[in-house]
């Protein structure tokens, strides 16, 4: 397996269920030369994104069904 040598951009918000998730997914769609991640500062680990975020992404033709919230600093 080859390591991903692309620069990493991490989007951070409080819960990693809305803002950072949306920013990461939209950035990943537009900036393929980077690896995008997201995290939160006060997180309930392992929760899916908010239903409003899922709906907003869908409105832009984007999805992220595997997203689970994670605490900043765990990667």
Question: Which residues does each predicted region cover?
Answer:
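Short polar/charged helix/loop
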Residues: 1-75
